[in-house]
């Protein structure tokens, strides 16, 4: 009976979920008919605690609904880990069409704790606390320092990050052979850290025996200092050179730390020579990092460098909807568009604004309406709109390029004047809600087609002109505060 029920659930979920989610989370579950109790209609065995927690939080409720549909009444579902000595289900492909090579997970030496679902809308906890059992697999995952919530499934994608995501998925599928190192750069709060954790989690799911470490540069620096103080550099070197995957965040903080750069240089060489994967994040293009040795910068160019840009409107709306889903709140499109239209800088700012709206609504006992959102974000929206005026953009760009603000309105076409003016037009279009005709009017009464041409020119030049791209990036960060 359990197999028939689970086959029904699998069939329905395969049509409801994206293939990536279905193959990663649902297809790895196995129905255990022998050990299902009289009160339990379906007992599912998850291959690891990581998968168990993820399924319980995101899919168990839906499985319960399908079970009730199959039986014609609410049922109880039990979600457990393999019993001691039991063989785990084989690992399945996670991303793309091809699996990542790696040994199957080792059996988990633990008594399986259960998570149960009674009626479709209710999830109950096991009598025994799940935290009372710690397996070797749990300890191995904890040592990676990965965030289990940061996966490719939970990453909202759009034009701003589609190239970076595609490259990251290639690296996760073929660590050490595709794009080594992978260098991801972009402004604060755009999802770089999420992306590197997603790589680590994908590799770990395929190969739990892989030695993975996520480390922020400041923690790496602290490890170097500790090794120096304790005279334990041999152990330090052995550890970092034993990794299969090194994910290092915010490399720009290596600036002027000579001993740390020296150690990382040798670790980098050892890992790449052994075909081990390195993924690096930074807030700027490699050649623009201040205080970093040229030999390191040149090695960053060995692999692939990709940029994550600020999310476009549609992507910002999708990010808000995803966050609302995680918070289990109903977010209407008009509220999402209000937030997304006015807050453009990064994902953290968007999520912070949504959290503020939700808290405001709950405190006042009101639903999340457009009026409530405007009240909750009144100060933030007013400050944002005051700061990002076309006049403010013109002054900031003029100061940056050391030209006069009057040049923004003039008819001069020399390169030293025309290019900054085009940059200012591009920023005005990207950072303000002003229409193209209104922007043109603010730049000396120019036609909207001139603004369109300027924006198109800057967008195209940014693809190949690293200095211009850096200028635009810096100006954007300055203007957004």
Swiss-Prot record:
Region described as Domain II: 74-144
Region (Domain IV, binds dsDNA): 362-481
InterPro entries, A to Z: AAA+_ATPase (IPR003593), Chromosome_initiator_DnaA (IPR001957), Chromosome_initiator_DnaA-like (IPR020591), Chromosome_initiator_DnaA_CS (IPR018312), DnaA_C (IPR013159), DnaA_dom (IPR013317), DnaA_N_dom (IPR024633), DnaA_N_sf (IPR038454)
Comp. bias (Low complexity): 111-123
GO cellular component labels: cytoplasm; plasma membrane
DNA-binding found in the keyword field: yes
SMART domains xref list: AAA, Bac_DnaA_C
Gene3D superfamilies: 1.10.1750.10, 1.10.8.60, 3.30.300.180, P-loop containing nucleotide triphosphate hydrolases (3.40.50.300)
Pfam families per UniProt: Bac_DnaA, Bac_DnaA_C, DnaA_N
Stretches the record annotates as Domain I, interacts with DnaA modulators: 1-74
Cell location: Cytoplasm
Recorded superkingdom: Bacteria
Example of a GO biological process term: regulation of DNA replication
Region (Disordered): 101-123
Function: Plays an essential role in the initiation and regulation of chromosomal replication. ATP-DnaA binds to the origin of replication (oriC) to initiate formation of the DNA replication initiation complex once per cell cycle. Binds the DnaA box (a 9 base pair repeat at the origin) and separates the double-stranded (ds)DNA. Forms a right-handed helical filament on oriC DNA; dsDNA binds to the exterior of the filament while single-stranded (ss)DNA is stabiized in the filament's interior.
Subunit and partners: Oligomerizes as a right-handed, spiral filament on DNA at oriC.
Record-linked NCBIfam families: DnaA
Protein name (Swiss-Prot/TrEMBL): Chromosomal replication initiator protein DnaA
């Amino acid at each position: 009976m359990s197999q028939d029920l689970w086959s029904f659930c699998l069939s329905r979920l395969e049509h409801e979920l994206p293939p990536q989610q279905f193959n990663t989370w649902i297809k790895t579950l196995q129905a255990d008919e022998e050990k299902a109790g009289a009160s339990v209609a379906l007992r599912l065995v998850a291959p690891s605690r990581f998968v168990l927690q993820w399924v319980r939080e995101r899919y168990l409720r839906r499985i319960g609904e399908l079970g009730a549909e199959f039986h014609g009444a609410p049922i109880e579902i039990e979600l457990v880990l393999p019993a001691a000595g039991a063989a785990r289900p084989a690992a399945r492909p996670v991303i793309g069409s091809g699996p990542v090579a790696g040994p199957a997970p080792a059996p988990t030496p633990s008594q399986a704790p259960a998570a149960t679902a009674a009626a479709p809308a209710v999830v109950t906890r096991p009598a025994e606390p799940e935290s009372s059992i710690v397996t070797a697999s749990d300890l191995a995952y904890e040592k990676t320092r990965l965030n289990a919530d940061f996966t490719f499934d939970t990453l909202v994608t759009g034009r701003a990050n589609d190239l970076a995501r595609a490259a990251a998925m290639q690296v996760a599928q073929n660590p050490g052979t595709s794009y080594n190192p992978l260098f991801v750069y972009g402004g604060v709060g755009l999802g770089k850290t999420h992306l590197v954790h997603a790589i680590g989690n994908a590799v770990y799911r395929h190969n739990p025996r892989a030695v993975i470490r996520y480390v922020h540069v400041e923690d790496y620096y602290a490890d170097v200092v500790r090794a120096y103080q304790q005279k334990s550099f041999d152990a330090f070197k052995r550890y970092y050179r034993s990794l299969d995957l090194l994910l290092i965040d915010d490399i720009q903080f290596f600036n002027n730390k000579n001993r740390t750069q020296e150690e990382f240089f040798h670790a980098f060489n050892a890992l790449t020579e052994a075909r081990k994967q390195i993924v690096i994040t930074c807030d700027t293009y490699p050649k623009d990092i201040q205080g970093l040795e040229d030999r390191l910068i040149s090695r960053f160019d060995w692999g692939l460098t990709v940029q994550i840009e600020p999310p476009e409107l549609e992507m910002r709306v999708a990010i808000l909807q995803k966050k609302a889903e995680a918070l289990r709140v109903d977010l209407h499109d008009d509220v999402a568009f209000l937030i997304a239209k006015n807050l453009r800088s990064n994902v953290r700012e968007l999520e912070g604004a949504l959290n503020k709206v939700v808290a405001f609504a709950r405190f006042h006992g009101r639903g999340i309406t457009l009026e409530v959102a405007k009240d909750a974000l009144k100060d933030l929206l007013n400050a944002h709109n005051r700061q990002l005026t076309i006049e403010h953009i013109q002054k900031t760009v003029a100061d940056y390029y050391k030209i006069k603000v009057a040049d923004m309105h003039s008819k001069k076409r020399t390169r030293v004047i025309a290019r900054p003016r085009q940059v200012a037009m591009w920023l005005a279009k990207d950072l303000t809600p002003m229409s193209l005709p209104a922007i043109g009017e603010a730049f000396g009464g120019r036609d909207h087609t001139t603004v369109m041409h300027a924006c198109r020119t800057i967008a195209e030049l940014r693809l190949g002109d690293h200095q211009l791209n850096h200028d635009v990036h810096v100006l954007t960060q300055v203007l957004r505060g």
